[in-house]
Amino acid sequence: DLQMYKGRQYIHDDKKIFGVFADSCPDRWGQRLMKRREELRAKNAGEKPRKLLDSDYLLGVYDEARMGGLRFKTELEGEFLSNDREFATPPWTSLRELEQASIAFENDEKGLNEKWLKQLLAPGSSLGGARPKASVLATDGSLWIAKFPSKHDDFNSGAWEMVVHELAVMCGLNVPEAKAEKFSRLGTTFLVKRFDRIESRRIHFSSAMTMLGKKDGANAADGSSYLEI
């Protein structure tokens, strides 16, 4: 939906953002964290929370953990946006603490506990999907995604993700390295190496949703299916 020429372009009426940028945006979990941050800011300032736009989600993601190869700045010679080292991606050794923060965040009905929010915001807001998750740095400096168990799980989702990953390997599919760890009785944390990084180099990617011109939430009801891929 974004054409290869310089100048202004306009999105179709049924979409809010070009697909190439949507791939760099947080999904439901990341948006939830960023909404909670705005609610907390507004509460402390005695204001009403402002409605966050897609551009707020796109540009508010912590730069180091942003998905894909795109980075953003407002001035050609300026700094990249959201690049504050105060929010650096946490190390592998903090996984247990991050899982506990995600559990506490889910159990906090109003979601205004600043302690849990600060721990999760930078490593978790950049990622897609609805599950609680965070980016972590392995000892070799590689970026991984940790997908934590959720209080809404009806089964051990992380363990089954590992099973599906192993099946993919057995089928000869090219999939990133993955691990399964258990830090609590709630379930298994599924860990997978980021496919959009080779050491410190960022890898551009385009999702099937973008390539097919779809938008988030599309499903079989409107004719969307894996057969199109």
Question: What is each stretch, according to the model?
Answer:
Residues 1-229:
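Phosphate/dinucleotide-binding and metal-coordinating scaffold of catalytic cores
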